[in-house]
Amino acid sequence: MRIFIAILFLIFSFQSWIKAEDISELEVEGISIGDSLLKIMSEEEIIDDMSTMYKNKKFSTVIYFRTETYDAIQFSFYTDDTNYIVYSIEAKLIFKHDIKSCLKKQKEIANVISEMIGNYTTYYPVEKQLRQSDPTGKSFMYPEAFVFENDDSMVQIYCTDWSEDFENKNWHDELKVSIWSDAFSKFLEHEAYK
């Protein structure tokens, strides 16, 4: 059974009995971990929009804007995979100069995620951290994660409170919901920046 995270923002439409035992049971805008990106994009669109954002080029990404719920969704897949099987889904919502609303929405989403996968995961609560991409040390993120117990697949939810310097460069406070397969989590931890 697939669970539609795309409607997370309609929080009360979820029933408390819906459970997901595996990361591939979670779905965003019709796509789950293990699906082909060809389900929603043509191969030409994928190739035209494909980029490798990590030092290690093992995975490529595509940013998808034709979404009903989010401002953008980033999908990652093996660079040499012509089937474009999805290993990571990262959905983003913009909160212009409004970290308070972002954190409120994060809490709502985390509560729903906990109901869905809490019995099968270890929960790591919100912990304010410096945002490494801001050399001024004035931007912060508030991550929390649900890591599946049978592997390293996870759901991470976090808000970023960008500093005024970044906001003046047209960066905005944002909420991200990331769904990472075991392979992608291990890639980020051990290979992405080598």
Where are these regions (language model features)?
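Short intrinsically disordered, low-complexity segments
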Residues: M1, L10, K55, Y64-F65
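Sec-dependent N-terminal signal peptides
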Residues: I3-W17
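Non-cytosolic coordination micro-motifs
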Residues: E21-F59, E90-K194
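Mid-chain, structured segments of secreted extracytoplasmic proteins
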Residues: V62-E108
